[in-house]
Amino acid sequence: MAIWQVDFYFVFNNTSDIPYAVLAEDSFIKLLSVFPIGKSWNNDLIVYGELDSTCICVWKDSNNVEISCRLDVSSIKLQEINAIINFADTNGLMIFCNEQTIFPTLDNIRKIIVDSSAYRFVKNPESFLNEINNNQL
């Protein structure tokens, strides 16, 4: 994951192992309109978007999937956030980030972004790197 990205997982009934059967197939089709299929380094991983930008990663096994999301704080678009929220809402998914399960809303995603080290880096790279150098993180 890049320094300008923040990530989180989607959970269903408080677990990251999501039964594939509960996911609406058309929700993935809708994702494609915003996030085309990107390059993957594993046959069991489907990447919607690009790994070094905003993307949704879907790990598949025989019955379950694990879904994570990376937000490119340096270039995030409202259309992308809305697509992520719609995907979660359509499938009854919650966001798991920083040891908390939260509803997938614009305000909650904004808070995830603003509270992230990625945001601090994008806002002021030199100050952020000085914090790292001075062990202030």
Where are the language model's segments positioned?
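Acidic (Asp/Glu-rich) sequence patches and key acidic residues
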Residues: 1-137
